[in-house]
Every structure is written in C-alpha cells, then in structure tokens.
Design a protein with these regions (language model features):
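Short, mixed-charge aromatic SLiMs
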Residues: 215-223, 274-275, 301-312
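Membrane-interfacial helix termini and the short, flexible loops that connect transmembrane helices
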Residues: 218, 257, 262-265, 297-304
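Short, glycine/acidic-rich hinge or "gate" loops at secondary-structure transitions
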Residues: 63, 208-211, 287-304
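Generic structural signal for alpha-helix starts
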Residues: 35-36, 177, 304, 308
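Short, flexible helix-adjacent loops and helix caps
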Residues: 161-162, 259, 291, 295-298, ...
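Residue patterns forming the tRNA-binding/recognition surfaces of aminoacyl-tRNA synthetases
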Residues: 1-108, 121, 192, 223, ...
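Alpha-helical recognition segments enriched in aromatics with Gly/Pro capping
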Residues: 59-61, 69, 88-92, 96, ...
Length: 328
C-alpha cells in the first residue's frame, strides 16, 4: 500500500538461532543448490547474518504457544504433548484451579481421527485452561500464537505426527532429510530457511539434500507483479485464451528454471503461431495424405545396430536421461 509501517516493541518468545549460526552455515555447505549462487550468495548471506527467530504472533487462527506462566511471572511451563497437558489439567483440578477437564474422554495413545475429533487445541479452547505451578499458583497461557513459518518448517516431521507416531520414518531417515525440494527464490527467507533451522536445531541434520530455487515470474518490464500496480496477469484468462501447452512451452523455453522470467502474453502468441502452428501444419499435412493413401505403419523395426549414427545417438541420449532420472 506504500503506507508507512509503525513499529513498537512487544514482549515475545524467541528461538536463539544465533547460538547455532555456525552449524547452520556448515550444513548449508553440504546442500546441492541449483543454482549454486543462491545457496552460497542469497541464502548463505542470510545465514551469515541470521538473527534470533521471533516466534510470537498476535493473531487468533494458528497454533497456540504451549507456554503457561504464573500470574507473578516467576514460574513457566512448556507443554510438549496432549498427554502432558491432560496430566497438568488433572493436577490443576486437584489443586482447585480448574473445575473439570475439557479433554475428558480423550484416549491417550489412540491416534485415530475419531479420538482427536473429541478435542480442540486452538486458542478459543486452550486459553480457558488454567494450570498449576509447583507452588500451586494459577498459570495462564501466553496469548500469542506460533509463527506460521514454524508450521511449514516442521512439515517433514509433522506430516507423520512425529514423535508420537511413525518414529522410524524420521529416526531411521526413511523420509528425512528430503532428497529434493523446489520453491521460488524468495523462500530463502521463508520455507528454505525454516526447514533448515528446525532440522539443524532439533535433529542436527540437513532437512534437504538437493534444492532447485526457481526464479520469479515478473511482468514484461521486469517489475514484480502487483495488484496495486495493475501489472498482474490473470493466469486463468491466459490459459483460456492461449491454452496450457503454449503457455507452458513459452515459460520453459524463455528462461532457465532458476532465472526470473519476464512474462509477456505477446510471447505466448508468438510461440503458438511459430511453434505450435508449424507443428499443427506438419501433422495436418501428414494426416491428410496418410488417410488418402491409407498409410499403415507395418514396417519392421530397425535394430539399433543397423540404424544410422544420428539415430543411435538420439536413442542413446534418451536412455541416458531415463537412467539418470531413475537413479536420482
């Protein structure tokens, strides 16, 4: 909006990333980046200057910070599981700080959807839970939520409900670290970073081995697309007008995957006319006369050794590519 942003200090919870900065840099050096310059430059420079991660967000929808603090601020509890939370609630009831357990009926250890449908771990429920400190003082949850980027960074383990289920998937490295991920170059401060930080801090490991950092799709003048500037291209209108094939071919033939693309619909029209138009005319010519002559392809397949050098070369290139993809 180009409006000035007002900053003011708030109490927040941080992850002390700066203590592990050297480890973050060391693990990054083991990652195969495409292009390499993104890993060493943009992402590497970001790690070199990494600050502590502000985890607190003052919102309603999201994952609540599982932190309870006594009224005088002298005691803190961090809850690590539903099982622990239920135990703490029962203790709070015993101490007279709560009347009942809202998770009554939940079966600890039962990982079925039906069982988890019995509880709600979001803010409007969790904020009503009052725990007891070791000295029986009332403890209330921190009102903030967790940064949503922490959710995405925890994806490799959260998707398997680790460590409560499927521990072997992660501990035995069956599904972690990832062999390959891909995202836009802007994720050097987003998903690439949060995956990397959590993997390093929690598992002392990379979260991914190989990464392709895609370039951004810009307008035809090289400016970032924006509704405010009115230079955004509607992808659905583009696909309806030119079709998906011409659009795909234009995008993959005009820049490397890791370079930014200056997107111009006039270029799609040119691709459709010159490439797909020519291809269509060739096929139409063949189809017309093949049907007139009732052509049938019953010719015997020529053995590889009997083919010309150019045929053998292109077949070899194809099978080399197939092998490299399968072995990757």
């Amino acid at each position: 909006t180009d409006k000035p942003v007002l900053y003011y200090p708030l109490n927040s919870w941080f992850i002390k990333v700066t203590e592990k900065r050297n480890e973050l840099i060391a693990f990054n050096n083991k990652i195969n980046w495409k292009p390499k310059s993104t890993g060493e430059g943009r992402f590497g420079n970001w790690l070199n200057n990494a600050n502590d991660w502000n985890l607190s967000r003052s919102r309603f929808w999201g994952i609540p910070l599982p932190i309870w603090i006594s009224e005088d601020g002298s005691e803190t509890k961090v809850i690590g599981s539903v099982k622990q939370l239920i135990e703490e609630i029962n203790q709070s009831i015993e101490d007279g700080n709560m009347d009942s357990n809202p998770f009554q009926g939940f079966e600890v250890g039962n990982m079925s959807n039906e069982n988890y449908d019995k509880i709600d771990l979001h803010k409007h429920t969790i904020d009503d839970i009052v725990l007891s400190s070791s000295s029986k003082k009332k403890m209330y949850r921190e009102s903030d939520l967790i940064d949503v980027w922490f959710d995405s960074g925890a994806m490799p383990y959260a998707q398997w409900h680790y460590p409560f289920e499927n521990k072997n998937y992660i501990d035995e490295k069956k599904f972690f670290p990832a062999d390959y991920i891909a995202e836009g170059v802007d994720q050097t401060r987003g998903w690439f970073y949060t995956l990397h930080v959590i993997g390093t801090l929690v598992f002392n490991s990379n979260s991914y081995k190989n990464v392709i950092s895609n370039g951004l799709v810009l307008d035809k003048n090289g400016q970032k697309m924006s509704k405010r500037l009115g230079n955004a291209v509607d992808p659905f209108e583009t696909l309806d007008r030119f079709g998906p094939d011409a659009t795909r071919w234009y995008m993959i033939s005009n820049s490397n995957p890791w370079d930014n693309l200056k997107f111009d619909v006039a270029g799609i029209e040119e691709v459709r006319r010159k490439f797909f138009g020519t291809l269509h005319n060739i096929y139409s010519f063949f189809s017309l006369y093949a049907n007139v002559d009732k052509f049938k392809n019953h010719e015997k397949i020529i053995e590889y050794k009997d083919r010309c050098e150019l045929d053998r070369w292109i077949i070899s290139e194809l099978n080399t590519l197939i092998k490299e993809v399968k072995d990757a």
